[in-house]
Amino acid sequence: MAKKVTGMIKLQLAAGKASPAPPVGPALGQHGVNIMAFCKEFNEKTAKQAGLIIPVVITVYQDRSFSFILKTPPAAVLIKKAVGIESGSGVPNKTKVAKITKEQLKEIAEMKMPDLNAGSVEAAMRMVAGTARSMGVTVEE
């Protein structure tokens, strides 16, 4: 028989830098999960992706064991990394902060494909382009 699920926790953590400090400790502590075991496992799995924010979905079972699924980094984080900016524009419709090429968009879209509900890479590119525009990043043709 399958283990009974008692909780689902969604967090966005810096790759390789999970520690028992907030937000990880309190979120896992209230479900009775071994915080250090999670941090160690998460940091091992994300060590290669240093510098990125990684969304993680943690499933907690009745016997206080857990499993987790790593998602792809948010499109906004990948766009900021691709164009080399610290943050998006405060007023994206007026102030443009950077330009992104179609090749960069395609690269990000292909990386995000497993987490997007897009049927094709072109549809995924349009989603990523929309995120870029909402950050004040101009998409070059």
Curated annotation (Swiss-Prot):
GO CC, any one term: cytosolic large ribosomal subunit
Signal peptide (residue range): none
Name of this chain's protein: Large ribosomal subunit protein uL11
Assigned protein family: Belongs to the universal ribosomal protein uL11 family.
Disulfide bonds: none
Superkingdom of source: Bacteria
A matching Pfam family: Ribosomal_L11_N
Subunit annotation: Part of the ribosomal stalk of the 50S ribosomal subunit. Interacts with L10 and the large rRNA to form the base of the stalk. L10 forms an elongated spine to which L12 dimers bind in a sequential fashion forming a multimeric L10(L12)X complex.
BP term (GO), one: translation
Keyword annotations: Methylation, Ribonucleoprotein, Ribosomal protein, RNA-binding, rRNA-binding
UniProt source species: Clostridium tetani (strain Massachusetts / E88)
UniProt function note: Forms part of the ribosomal stalk which helps the ribosome interact with GTP-bound translation factors.
The UniProt record lists the keyword Phosphoprotein: no
A molecular function (GO) term: structural constituent of ribosome
Keyword Transmembrane belongs to the record: no
SMART domains recorded: RL11
Post-translational modification: One or more lysine residues are methylated.
